[in-house]
Amino acid sequence: MFLEDASDALYPMRTYIESSMTEEGNSVANMMCLMTTRIEAIAKGIDKEQIASFVHAVLSANRIYVMGAGRSGLVAKSFAMRLMHTGFISYVVGETITPAIAEGDLIVAFSGSGNTKTIGDIAETAKGIGAKVALISSNPDSRIGRIADYIIKIETQRDPVTCDAHEYEIRQMLGEHRSFAPLGTIFETSSLIFSDAVISTIMTMRQIEE
């Protein structure tokens, strides 16, 4: 009898938990649909001539260097790995095995603001050496954008970062690197999908199978 009473007492709680889990599941699915719709709009808005120029730059480069800070850095590393798997010579800037850049190489910067200090410093150095600079950013009118040979604009409509004089890590520690709710990672997600699409296009052009 006691067990039956306890079970009856717990029934409303179980019902509430199950209902909450269903609502959370629906919320996640709805958010995925929202992000998919937003990324589709972003993809359609990217200049097709810019894409073609970028793909040509990748195909014609002697070596490809990639870089980014924070989440953008993770996207850059993913792109470098996929390039390597496709037969390109690719490096991540800052790794211990990365050789010096030279004329004829391409450096690809992933930066939402286009103003991250370390990324800008490296881009300017590479440009001075004679390498080509490509920028994946939501802000082409930026420090890196002004020296870039190729620009892919990822239009995210995110609020501007107002403290570009600080390093990404310093802004993060100070709490000045804000999350842009509800789609705070939309630039990185769109950049990742864009870079994967570039790889897929090159694989098709070169008739490479997975």
Describe each model-derived feature in a short phrase.
Residues 2-44:
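Generic N-terminal amphipathic, Lys/Arg-enriched alpha-helix
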Residues 34, 41, 53, 193, ...:
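Alpha-helical scaffold segments in soluble metabolic enzymes
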Residues 65-69, 75-189:
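Glycine-rich phosphate-binding loops that contact phosphosugars or nucleotide phosphates
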Residues 43-60:
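A short, well-structured juxtamembrane/interface segment
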Residues 48-49, 53, 204-210:
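Active-site phosphate/pyrophosphate-binding segments
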Residues 183-197, 201-208:
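An accessory alpha-helical subdomain
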